[in-house]
Every structure is written in C-alpha cells, then in structure tokens.
Amino acid sequence: MPLTVRVITPDKTVWDGDVQEAILPSTSGQLGILAGHAPLLTALDTGVIRVRPDKEWKSIAVMGGFAEVELDEIKVLVNSAEAGDAIDKEAAKAEYDAAQSRLEEASKGGEPREQMKAANAYKRARARLQAAGGLV
C-alpha cells in the first residue's frame, strides 16, 4: 500500500503522487516514513525531501515548513520548494560556492545578524545543490 505525498507551496503544488517511502528533513533530524506510519505533525528544516515512487529516488529542496502524516498521506506545507530535476545544477553549484564564501567571511568576525543571514543562505544553497544531485 503506497503513501500519497503532496508538497504544496502558496502558489503551486511541487509534488503530488504515490511513493513507497519518504524521508523528511525534520527539525530534530531525518525522518523516514513508510505506509502505516503513526499520525504525526512535525516542523521541517531547510533541506531535501527524498521520495521513492518506484526504484528511483526523487529529491525536492524545501525551505522549512511543516509536514502532517495521517492515513498513509503526507502533506508538506512550505513557503518554497523545488523539484530536484527542475534545478540547474551548474547555477546551484555557483550559488553554493558563493554562499559558502559569504559564510566563511561572516564567520571571521562579522556581526551576528550577518552570520545568521549567511548561514541561512548557505543552508538554502546546500539544499538546492543536494536536490539537484550535485552534493551527497
């Protein structure tokens, strides 16, 4: 019996389909969901949702949000999400490199606010690059 996964942003549905398994980036760590999972509501961190509709895994970059698991259905509500196959890997790599440099620079004595902004930009860039298949 498959799980139905829906990844929804305010302006579009990024994923809507049946999967055998899903892995969510919850704020307390990676969370694996199979059919028959107990009901659950969890906050999501910026990261990558991985779904397995058949033998191949698919990746979706998400920028935080919430996930609800109930009756073999996972509803993911996020402000921003991108399917990994829709992300330009080269552009994502350039964004990741720039964010990494900015984070290193901010860590060398920048203001706490700048350090936090750089860390958040790095997490977003890393999630996008991972979803595109450029980072393991």
Swiss-Prot record:
Residue ranges, compositional bias (Basic and acidic residues): 98-116
GO CC term (a single one): plasma membrane-derived thylakoid membrane
Entry annotated with the keyword Transport: yes
InterPro entries: ATP_synth_F1_dsu/esu (IPR001469), ATP_synth_F1_dsu/esu_N (IPR020546), ATP_synth_F1_esu_C (IPR020547), ATPsynth_dsu/esu_N (IPR036771)
Key word Thylakoid present: yes
A family per Pfam: ATP-synt_DE
Subunit structure: F-type ATPases have 2 components, CF(1) - the catalytic core - and CF(0) - the membrane proton channel. CF(1) has five subunits: alpha(3), beta(3), gamma(1), delta(1), epsilon(1). CF(0) has three main subunits: a, b and c.
Protein keywords: ATP synthesis, CF(1), Hydrogen ion transport, Ion transport, Membrane, Thylakoid, Transport
SUPFAM superfamilies associated with the record: Epsilon subunit of F1F0-ATP synthase N-terminal domain
NCBIfam families named in the record: ATP_synt_epsi
Principal place of residence: membrane
Gene Ontology MF: a single term: ATP binding
Topology with respect to the bilayer: Peripheral membrane protein
Family affiliation: Belongs to the ATPase epsilon chain family.
PANTHER family membership: ATP SYNTHASE DELTA/EPSILON CHAIN (PTHR13822), ATP SYNTHASE EPSILON CHAIN, CHLOROPLASTIC (PTHR13822:SF10)
Protein name stated in the entry: ATP synthase epsilon chain
Subcellular locations according to the entry: Cellular thylakoid membrane
UniProt function note: Produces ATP from ADP in the presence of a proton gradient across the membrane.
Region (Disordered): 98-120
